[in-house]
């Protein structure tokens, strides 16, 4: 099953994670604050580059974020060009950031209000785990969207 996926945040963890999703046959669009890094990723993995998180999320079935902290997460989700502005109804948003429980609850409520699902999915395994596609993912959220997202999450875990 090939899906339309967006991945926001191409740091030492996100870059290879998004790569594994692409290698599994999914159509991946990436966004990174440093556009040159996104362009490098797109060339390496044959993906697409978006100018904003909002553009990346548009029409995606699954939206992933892997950013630095709560403030970065708020910016890419709820900010002026955040993904919550364009995430389509029925899509599933998976956050791999190690963030606070408060922001996870906030994003869950906001996603529900906009008609899409949210999974809080922090990761463990470090850069080596990300590069090897063997991360441990601890997912919190509703079971039905988890079951739908699990095959995509499995690409990097």
Each model region followed by its residue ranges:
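NAD(P)+-binding Rossmann beta1-loop-alpha1 motif at the extreme N-terminus of oxidoreductases
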Residues: 1-58, 62-65, 91, 97, ...
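Hydrophobic alpha-helical segments typical of transmembrane helices
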Residues: 17, 37, 52, 72, ...
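Short amphipathic alpha-helical segments
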Residues: 18-20, 42-43, 75-78, 105-109, ...
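A generic "binding-loop/recognition-motif" signal
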Residues: 34, 69, 142
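Short low-complexity, flexible loop/linker segments enriched in glycine and/or proline
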Residues: 44-46, 65, 81, 133-137
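Rossmann-fold NAD(P) dinucleotide-binding segment
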Residues: 53-117
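Rossmann-fold dinucleotide-binding core
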Residues: 99-157
